[in-house]
Amino acid sequence: MKPISIAIDGPSGAGKSTIARKSAEKFGFIYVDTGAIYRTVGLAAYRRGIASKDSAAVIAMLPELHIELRHGPDGLQRMFLDGEDVSDAIRMPEISIYASDVSAVPEVRAFLMEMQRSFARTQNVIMNGRDIGTVVLPDAGLKIFLTASVEARAKRRQLELEKKGKSLPFEEVLRDMEYRDKNDSSRAAAPLRPAEDAVRLDTTQLDFDESCAAVESLIRERFAL
């Protein structure tokens, strides 16, 4: 029987990661956050002193990288760069822009494509990102496009950072969010857009539990789980 694959796409701060992780846990699926993979490439460039928009230098460093995505006993995803667990380091605010810029480089996307697709070949998976339903898993059994107003997404990101002990002014978080929205939707390589057959879900007025319930309902309905 062919494994079930579910694609959850959407802009930064829409709740993709937390909702996808919770849903994967609910149904016993593997969870893959592709954004964390791009953040790991961004972190590698940042640590090497490479400008985020220096595509040539970013491409040149790719053969040197050893990136691993592992799942712990708790099912949580951990990212490793050259053997180091960088799962927390990639969440630094300054890495967000790096991740957005390097993900716009076609060579970076091609470099990471096989890693992403390999997870869906032998196991049930919920994968979230920006081009999962359109490029990475175009044949996914269910495609969901999560969105919310940019203000709501910026507020969520600010609260998320505060929980990690990182306080940033709302205006700064909002500017970063608007920058990423523009960058992600206008890039030439796999721009952010809903797949034609994606179910669109606006979570602006929904809290976390309500958003999870809506996604889980879609999964149950589609796959009779």
Question: What are these language model-derived features?
Answer:
Residues I8:
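Hydrophobic anchor at the beta1->P-loop junction of P-loop NTPases
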Residues S12:
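The conserved Walker
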Residues K16:
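Conserved lysine of the Walker
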Residues I19:
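Hydrophobic positions on the alpha1 helix immediately C-terminal to the Walker A/P-loop
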Residues E25-M92:
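N-terminal phosphate/diphosphate-binding loop that engages ATP/GTP or pyrophosphate donors
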Residues G35, G83, L112, I126, ...:
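Residue-level signal for inorganic ion chemistry
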Residues H71, Q116-Q123, R130-V135, D139, ...:
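Small-molecule kinase domains that catalyze NTP-dependent phosphoryl transfer to phosphate-bearing small molecules
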Residues S87-K164:
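ATP-dependent NMP and nucleoside kinases share a basic, alpha-helical "lid"
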